[in-house]
């Protein structure tokens, strides 16, 4: 699944975002692309289940691929 981030992103956002996504699914593979402002997550969960974690970290995202 892939999410588009509407907020500005910096390289120091990568760690907190990865931890937030792994709080939803500890086995998830998370890839953050700061330049493209996208986050790819390989998980068996539904994309909607990650939206709360993004919101908790104050990121406004949309699902662009499920």
What are these regions (language model features)?
Residues 37-42:
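A generic structural motif
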Residues 21-33, 60:
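Short acidic amphipathic segments
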Residues 8-24:
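Short amphipathic alpha-helix segments
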Residues 59-66:
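Conserved short beta-strand edge segments in small beta-sheet-based binding/regulatory domains
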Residues 1-8:
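Short glycine-/aliphatic-rich beta-strand segments at the starts of folded cytosolic domains
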Residues 47-59:
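Charge-rich, low-aromatic oligomerization/scaffolding segments with amphipathic character
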């Amino acid at each position: 699944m892939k999410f588009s981030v509407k907020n500005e992103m910096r390289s120091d956002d990568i760690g907190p975002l990865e931890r937030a996504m792994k709080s939803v699914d500890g086995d998830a593979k998370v890839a953050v692309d700061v330049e493209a402002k996208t986050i790819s997550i390989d998980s068996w969960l539904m994309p909607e289940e990650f939206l709360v974690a993004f919101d908790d970290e104050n990121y406004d995202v949309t699902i662009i691929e499920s």
